[in-house]
Amino acid sequence: MKFGAQTEYGRLRKVLMHRPTEENRRITPGNKDAYLFRDVVYWKEFQREHDVFSDLLRDEGIEVVMLTDLLDEDQAGIAETLPNMVYTRDVCMVSRLGAHSLRMTYAARQVEPFLVEKAMEKLGVPIAQRITPPALVEGGDFVWLNEETVMMGFITRSNEAGVNMVRERLMGGGAVKEFVAVPLPSFRVHLDGAVMAMSPDIALFHEASLGLYPAYVYDGEGVRLQYLRDYLEGKGLEIIEGNDTEVRMFGTNIIGLGDYKCVSYEWNERIIGILDDRGFDVLTIPGSQLSIGGGGPHCMTCPILRE
């Protein structure tokens, strides 16, 4: 089968998701931090909001593959006990080389890559890489600038060993020509919460998250230091600033569908307006419960194929 998703804005053809069931009933005020949730959620509304999102993607002609449909009964039963499994982005990244099976930082998510790897094998996507200790890599730290360039955040969830493993595989395998490693401050969980390439010439950007430390830009000539904003502007991108409140509420965590169409949470009104002025068609979904888990539309999708 065809696979590979090396942009954020190419036509999205196939995506892996996980429909939440009653696993979120496990979350209590006492264990919510261990489960990486901001608070308890009402599981039926959480599920309903997710259904709205997945139905929207199907209505746009995107093939939505649900994780549990690819697992055996025992594996599916385990998946339905994992509150964070809904954020499939973090568990796997699919490049033109195949699926990169990642390694999660916290105990609440450690088994997720095993399940997603089984799903990728069932789909016929080759496993291009398995992240192994001491490396840690979470998929929310990948943001593709274009087909030849990927940005990867590290420090908070992914680590330096993970950066090196992924960089060596992608660059060594000829999948990318430039690899930009972006150090994140302690308050920023993943890179996709602070920057998003909306098109070849427009990016959402949060200066408070990304302006503290220079990034490492690797290319065929070696490595150089450059602040990410300067790097993006040097590539000719227009920067649209997200403010602290918007970023807290996943205002930059948008999933592109292709042809200047994308999906955002419905309350992201200012950024939606700016994108609308630039010719984007921004589709919206509710997320009063989904966002409590700590993710947005980008987080809940693991692209398998873009064109």
What are these regions (language model features)?
Residues 1-307:
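The feature marks the mature, well-folded catalytic cores of soluble enzymes
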